[in-house]
Amino acid sequence: MNRKHDGASISFQPRIRRGAFFEACWDHGCRNFSVYNRTYISSTFSNPVDEYWHVINHVSLWPVMGERQIEISGDDAERFVQYITCRDISNCSVNQCKYALLLNNEGGIICDPILLRLEENKFWISTSDCDLELWIKGVQINSGFNVQIKDANVSLLQ
């Protein structure tokens, strides 16, 4: 069933984060937002047809505020990151990114993030709309790996 919800609005709640570019998007006319990874993200600034032609004929800058960076650091960071992904990261140099798969015990895909090696023992995992930080902390809790896991609290642009 297709229903129109003309006039629908969204209430901004404190439990949903406003990314670093939220106010700038608002100031530039965005009045349509959606929630992605517990973050308000800008949806449209005018109308979809005008925005399509703008992307085709001009330049667009997209705040991907909902893509969170999970930081894994510590003496065992490389071994732990290798433990949670099936991608061989032994040849991942500092300042290099790799596409990685994180799988559950049955081989199902949990998430397919981009992995960035910032330092020898510091990685960022760029997560999409999933609770990956909680899953990673759950894997680490009794693993014996000496790592720290946290939200890097940065905002990205594409």
What positions do the PLM features span?
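Acidic, proline/glycine-enriched N-terminal capping motif
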Residues: 1-103, 108
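Acidic, low-complexity central loop/insert segments
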Residues: 111-158
